[in-house]
């Protein structure tokens, strides 16, 4: 089973890129994990936020495969502590036959089409983070979950 993080737009700041790639590589010691970047839209000034979400939603839909289990990172999703998230991941890793796909949307969130394709929504926090920063926070939590499940020394309760 493969786990994929889909994000809209490239990561710009080099220190985030370095840290994200480090956690992705660390996570690959435990599971098949990668990050897929949907190119950011060009000429968005003429689009309403709703139109931008629709166009991004079309690109996200093209990146999905039949059988994917889709989980949105969404401010209205379920919040979990790290150990809870690890147990949640464990269940998903056992029960998902194809890909477990996490999606971080664009600046205005997700289109209804993407919400309709989702199986679940999770939230990283009640706080708002930049789209650059949440990528790093999330890949670190995936790595942390894997170390919890495998008895590694990374997480301290």
From Swiss-Prot:
SUPFAM superfamilies hit by this protein: alpha/beta knot
Catalytic reaction equation(s): pseudouridine(1915) in 23S rRNA + S-adenosyl-L-methionine = N(3)-methylpseudouridine(1915) in 23S rRNA + S-adenosyl-L-homocysteine + H(+)
Key word ATP-binding present: no
InterPro entries: Alpha/beta_knot_MTases (IPR029028), RlmH-like (IPR003742), tRNA_m1G_MTases_N (IPR029026)
Localisation per UniProt entry: Cytoplasm
Main location: cytoplasm
Positions with a binding annotation for S-adenosyl-L-methionine: 73, 105, 124-129
HAMAP family the UniProt entry points to: 23SrRNA_methyltr_H (MF_00658)
PANTHER family according to UniProt: METHYLTRANSFERASE, RIBOSOMAL RNA LARGE SUBUNIT METHYLTRANSFERASE H
Entry's family note: Belongs to the RNA methyltransferase RlmH family.
Protein name per UniProt: Ribosomal RNA large subunit methyltransferase H
Gene: rlmH
